[in-house]
């Protein structure tokens, strides 16, 4: 009857969820090392956020005052960068197309004589076949 769940004490139930052995030395060392490091990095992140907000609060009036100059300048720079990138992309596309075309022509030049010989043989065979057929028909007409 002691095995039934309602007969167990609450401390026994809690102990059943806990691991039987404690953390290893390397795990404890990792926590001891990384916890302060994480805290320091979190503090630095907070300081940087605070500095950014203060800097933005100070610089916002300057951005508002100089916005008639800054906005067109930013747009001009953005368009110039876009133009350079587009030009480069088109240049690379053109070079790769020319390279492909040259390789294609080189491959075709090597196989062109073979293709011409094959076409010549087919024409000769076709002409020879037609000549034989015409000769056969003429002999059939002559022999009644």
Swiss-Prot record:
Family per record: Belongs to the oleosin family.
Free-text note on domains in this protein's UniProt record: The proline-knot motif may be involved in the targeting to oil bodies.
Domain of life per record: Eukaryota
Function noted in UniProt: May have a structural role to stabilize the lipid body during desiccation of the seed by preventing coalescence of the oil. Probably interacts with both lipid and phospholipid moieties of lipid bodies. May also provide recognition signals for specific lipase anchorage in lipolysis during seedling growth.
Spans through the membrane: 28-48, 53-73, 75-95
Main localization of the protein described in the UniProt heading: other
Any single GO CC term annotated in Swiss-Prot or TrEMBL for this entry: monolayer-surrounded lipid storage body
Tissue: Expressed in seeds (at protein level).
Subcellular location: Lipid droplet; Membrane
Keyword Translocase attributed: no
Bilayer disposition of the protein: Multi-pass membrane protein
Pfam families in alphabetical order: Oleosin
GO biological process: lipid droplet organization; lipid storage; response to freezing; seed maturation; seed oilbody biogenesis
Disulfide bonding pattern of the chain: none
Annotated stretches, region: Disordered: 124-144
Keywords: Acetylation, Lipid droplet, Membrane, Transmembrane, Transmembrane helix
Protein name (record): Oleosin H2
Residues recorded as bearing N-acetylalanine in the entry: 2
InterPro entries the record matches: Oleosin
Sequence motif Proline-knot, residues: 61-72
Natural source organism: Sesamum indicum (Oriental sesame)
């Amino acid at each position: 009857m002691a095995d039934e769940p309602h007969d167990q004490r609450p401390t026994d139930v809690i102990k059943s969820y806990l691991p039987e052995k404690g953390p290893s030395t390397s795990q404890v060392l990792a926590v001891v090392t990384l916890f302060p490091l994480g805290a320091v990095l979190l503090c630095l992140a907070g300081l940087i956020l605070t500095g950014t907000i203060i800097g933005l609060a100070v610089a916002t009036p300057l951005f508002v005052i100089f916005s008639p100059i800054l906005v067109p300048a930013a747009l001009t720079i953005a368009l110039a960068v876009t133009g350079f990138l587009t030009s480069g992309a088109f240049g690379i596309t053109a070079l790769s197309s020319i390279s492909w075309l040259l390789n294609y022509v080189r491959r075709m030049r090597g196989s062109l004589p073979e293709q011409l010989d094959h076409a010549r043989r087919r024409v000769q065979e076709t002409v020879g076949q037609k000549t034989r057929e015409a000769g056969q028909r003429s002999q059939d007409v002559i022999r009644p």
